[in-house]
């Protein structure tokens, strides 16, 4: 075995391992070795390479890698095809910024073809950084043969899906109100909108709509979007709701009966009550009357009107609201549009022409106030949708869009979702299920440039539609010969014209591109260019056994995968979904570059290593919970877990090499109870870890491993050190080497999916082979000893209590104490005699015994809890307090046992005192201190005799010299001669403990003499000792 370089950094170790993986093609071998095995199917959600990775990507990549590595080691064949999401607005916006242009008009002036070329060039801006990040974090995925959404084969598969959907009659062109981003100048789908809600404060207005031909009668309508008022064409009431006419300050207002108090507040008089249906068709004067409205400005009925907020009357602007649009269509009212594609008012609103509508709420309200049409205004906090790409507030516009009739097969969506196992489980019928229940038809088209072109050609004469399902299909119907290298992007496909099979006229492609979420949702099919090739491979790789992404993908990729597959095949595309929580800063705030609280995962790997970052992300909390995260979290993972494991591994290699121990040779071994215990712990942990991993409970698995590593380091190795330090190779020492070797090799396999670099380093050095080509550990039932584990757990509890006891009383473990008494509160069959030496040695006590009668070593003190007893006992509280103080210890003991006592205040007058009225304090026998955990109480004799004090000094001296040896980098097995120069009292103490010193410090000869200032000095409290070490002769 190679010597472990303890000075090598984690980053250095990981770079070395990466180099070895690449040189030996370990990733490729891990897949090839499973050829013919059952497939475990994994889908990679495609990131975009025109932005840099963040900590959330580190979490996602870690989880996906853990799954793939574990399943591979568990015997499955796991293909891992990378992917790139390359279309969409972020790319366009980046190119616009690069070119110094803005908006569709300037793009078209620049030229669609050169703009598309720039988009294609920019999509892999950060590919090199993504590749380096992916490799540095240890995520094994095939980045040399990825699926790329901009490539013709991928787009052709998407066209086949869309063509099939069109063939089924589920793709249609419709006129409806859709969410619209005025900055990007395109509509969005409902699942895109769901990703961008923000809590904002907007100006709301309660508006006076004057009843036509009345003197002073007004309908009151409330709106949170004053900018829509110029497009008002009607007011809606609920036909079955009650409304009142109420007089206030000379005006009569019509408002819902349930809302009158909230709206009018005070000083009003209800004149009459009316059903909503009585108000229908009453005309009013619009605040912004438009001559284009030839049928409108009247009250209509609508079921969506409620009395939950506002006035119970809804202002209707059909161009900017889905409900508004539907009710106006059914009533046959006029339609009014006063906003252009940039979100600015048109000449229809002259005094605001050219202004962005969301900036005009104040102008509108001022106008209303000037015209005496404003009843009330206030800031209103509500959740408002923003563009998930550019962060601009969205508007709702009526216009033409291409839609997929997802609502027609809603039952298929719901049934398919019912077959999926969600982590966490509540997502199935909660966040995701509710979204499916309320879904609307998918707005698939985008009025942009860089994306998969919508493959629908329309006849200019008869409106017939043709949706080619392949390039060959398009060529077959093309009016002219199409280039062999036809690129399936704008403007190239726009140049292809098709002859209408119905009337013989020319058909042109509809100009839109499609929603990028349809691109990524098509990846199970398009990544293999299905159905044009790789049919067997596709069938083997569909559906996915598991997918894992952030919770924000609930209405993104998780939805689009489910939707595309249901529309195309009717089948569900995945069996399990891991919905990962957000990674927040240490204050619980969302990380953001603008806030300055974002952590760069590349920097974290560079500082602490990928293993530490991965472990920190895994062990902190359940993966679906939001987690607070900081550099300190990663540093703690490194020091507590990775470094602890490396220290154990380094210790083993150091001593095994010194003793020339060879794990491949056969030795006479005699296992101790400690060996049997650690092997049982190893295999019971293996059992728990496998169970947790099979159920995707990665945090539980990681915590089990962390507990095991801690116990191996701080209990097994520490308790076994004397065996390793012995000279020669006896049977117990050979057993210690054999056991620790087996433990380390098995742990390296257990942690291989979690921390692949340190796992590889340990396994490679101990066995000569890559851990990632091994099988995952299986439980050896014959090594399980539950009783032994329970006993050792009890010992560990007692030792921990003893240490805590010492800390509370500032008694260092180096200071011997006379006695430890263990009080057992529950009888059990624990054989403490077998563990006597361990407890005494760990807690440095001279005697140890177990006592069942705790009254021998403890007593109780009762103090009245005046806070509770005062109100209960009133004037008698002081008398009760005095009575408590004079109780005998037997009476106190009886009170503690029965939890009640009766105090006779006066003849015939009794008070019942319970443990709720009293503070019960357990007090140790004089000279003893106690610590308890409910199961056990540890009593330590704290009287330190002169003899014990001197031994404590000697042990403290041993510690100081051991540290000094480390500073000198002396070999651990080097025997030395020691010369000391110190005061006479310390000389005598050390002389009295000469054997103890020689045994623990590998000292052949101790002498005392005069040393100069040039010699080194040690500090033992306030005492100084000069020391000189030399190699023993």
UniProtKB/Swiss-Prot annotation:
Motif mapping: 'HIGH' region: 47-57
**Catalytic function, reaction form:** tRNA(Ile) + L-isoleucine + ATP = L-isoleucyl-tRNA(Ile) + AMP + diphosphate
Binding residues for ATP: 593
Record's keyword annotation contains Cell membrane? no
Keyword flag Protein biosynthesis: yes
What EC number(s) would the UniProt record show?
Answer: 6.1.1.5
- CDD domains, sorted: Anticodon_Ia_Ile_ABEc (cd07961), IleRS_core (cd00818)
InterPro entries attached to this UniProt entry = aa-tRNA-synth_I_CS, aa-tRNA-synth_Ia, Anticodon_Ile_ABEc, Ile-tRNA-ligase, Ile-tRNA-ligase_type2, M/V/L/I-tRNA-synth_anticd-bd, Rossmann-like_a/b/a_fold, tRNAsynth_Ia_anticodon-bd
The processes (GO biological process) annotated in the record are: isoleucyl-tRNA aminoacylation
- Mainly resides where? cytoplasm
Gene3D superfamilies named in the record: HUPs, Isoleucyl-tRNA Synthetase, Domain 1
Q: In which compartments does the protein localize?
A: Cytoplasm
Q: Which GO terms describe its cellular component?
A: cytoplasm
Cofactors demanded by this protein: Zn(2+)
Give GO MF terms, alphabetically. aminoacyl-tRNA deacylase activity; ATP binding; isoleucine-tRNA ligase activity; tRNA binding; zinc ion binding
- Pfam families linked: Anticodon_1, DUF5915, tRNA-synt_1
Keywords attached to this entry: Aminoacyl-tRNA synthetase, ATP-binding, Cytoplasm, Ligase, Metal-binding, Nucleotide-binding, Protein biosynthesis, Zinc
Q: Where is this motif: 'KMSKS' region?
A: 590-594
Q: What does this protein do?
A: Catalyzes the attachment of isoleucine to tRNA(Ile). As IleRS can inadvertently accommodate and process structurally similar amino acids such as valine, to avoid such errors it has two additional distinct tRNA(Ile)-dependent editing activities. One activity is designated as 'pretransfer' editing and involves the hydrolysis of activated Val-AMP. The other activity is designated 'posttransfer' editing and involves deacylation of mischarged Val-tRNA(Ile).
Q: Tell me the domain comment.
A: IleRS has two distinct active sites: one for aminoacylation and one for editing. The misactivated valine is translocated from the active site to the editing site, which sterically excludes the correctly activated isoleucine. The single editing site contains two valyl binding pockets, one specific for each substrate (Val-AMP or Val-tRNA(Ile)).
User: What family does this chain come from, according to its entry?
Assistant: Belongs to the class-I aminoacyl-tRNA synthetase family. IleS type 2 subfamily.
| HAMAP family tied to this protein | Ile_tRNA_synth_type2
Q: How does it assemble?
A: Monomer.
Protein's recorded name: Isoleucine--tRNA ligase 2
Q: Which gene encodes it?
A: ileS2
